[in-house]
Amino acid sequence: MRKAHKKRSIHLVCNAHLDPVWQWEWEEGAAAAISTFRTAADLCEEYPGLIFNHNEAILYQWIEDYEPSLFQRIQKLVQEKKWQIMGGWYLQPDCNMPCGESFVRQILLGRRYFREKFGVMPTTAINFDSFGHTRGLVQILAKSGYDSYLFWRPFPEDCVLEKEEFIWEGYDGSRVLATRAYGGYSSAYGWARLKTEAFMKQRPDIVCGVLLWGIGNHGGGPSRVDLENLNQLTRETEVLDIRHSTPEAYFKELKQQDLPVHKKDLNPWGVGCYTSGVKIKQTHRRLENEFYAAEKMIASAWCQGMMAYPEAQLQEALKDLATSQFHDILPGESIQEVIESSLQIMDHGLEILSRLKAKAFFSLTQGQTPARENEIPILVYNPHPFAIETDVVCEFQLADMNLSGTFTQVTAYQEGQPLPTQVEKESSNIPFDWRKRIVFNAKLAPSQMNRFDCRLEAIPQKPKPELKVKDKRIVVKSTDMEVIINAATGLIDRYRVRGVDCLSKSACHPLVMFDSEDPW
């Protein structure tokens, strides 16, 4: 029982950090989640006062799918306030690389799940294990109903803070309370008391502190040994109120303090993770772009009554995207089996989106005017809510093989006006004038289908570009760019963009550089 005269406190947040994948595949992660949650439920039912905290909707979904009886026990413990739904996100993503909307969806997936299954909405976001945190997160957190943020990385030696407890301010002035957890998110078996004592020694003047404990990385959570040791420490300590708690309870007490304001990212850590595993990163970005573009197209077609809204399929693709953003997947430092299965998950999402986008596209093309003779219509959807100017690249098939010896020239028109158009080498290597690949510059109206009519004209022969060499130089210029190629060496002597030289004199030369084999 706590003594009323104790002014200072340490909130013990029992958890069991469990990466769904990392040095193991997801099936092993699911098994570890079941084992960990079962042990935690047993101890919560046995020990009065113990509160187990855990996050990540993906883990709870595994429990719900593979051990429903345990899931029901957890629901009961949450109602009894012996089990705290912590964080409330789908999982702990990388917190630098996803776009802002993806962070919103991580939160949305988690919030909806935990509200439906447990009737709760956490107000403290947690990303203990993410390798850094963009400042842009702050306004997303604040506008999503969070008032606080608990993290661990980057370490103090990598990211120096005025104080470990602070107010984090975003670009727009939004603010959340934030704390860098002492000594990591877990404690080794039998070491929870030692970690707590070390914290007390290192922060002797702490007024309100938080300490994460419980066996972690591959799950584990609380143990009877650690619980007995911590309960004994609580009884022996006179100057501090040490109690089992939750992140929300900690931050409710912390907000009474006068804290410094931090107006920067929380970076860096593990910088190699942001250049390693390029295939994972490229596929993720493609999936991310495809999802939001397809979703906008589908919404437009649905609003116009052209198709039913495929909510279940979109949710499936969104979960594939959210999973790919996990902080041990997107940075690319998991084992090869995880990398391969993660690419498979992303390909699954891409396949769903490919089919949905095609359906939306064909729905949105309804009612188009038939093409005239010697014209090929090209339809381009702009998913953005604003007009854009871009280069459109497309291929199409002529009505038949052109075996006459002439060449089919193509010019794109928009509303009867010709556009700058270039015929390029098509993907096919069949040596006939049959497939056509063109590029044209155009302005696309927002959130709608844009039509371009490609007019076909037979000319005597395929145009041959002329290479003009002057003063032993080949010069290529546009309004923004200038490239000068040395005709004698073949090297680029100048590459200037908007008046800024982008190449030094030593550019394009091979270099021997020291590199580290450490991917972190």
Task: Give, region by region, the residue ranges found by the protein language model.
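Solvent-exposed beta-strand/loop surfaces of large extracellular or lumenal domains
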Residues: 404-437
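Beta-strand-rich N-terminal accessory domains
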Residues: 387, 455-512, 517
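Short acidic, Pro/Gly- and aromatic-enriched capping/linker segments at domain boundaries
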Residues: 2-7, 162, 235, 426-443, ...
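Short linear motifs in intrinsically disordered
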Residues: 94, 153-160, 368, 396-404, ...
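Surface-exposed beta-strand/loop patches in extracellular or lumenal glycoproteins
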Residues: 384-410
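Catalytic-domain carbohydrate-binding cleft regions of carbohydrate-active enzymes
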Residues: 1-383, 390, 415-419, 438-450, ...
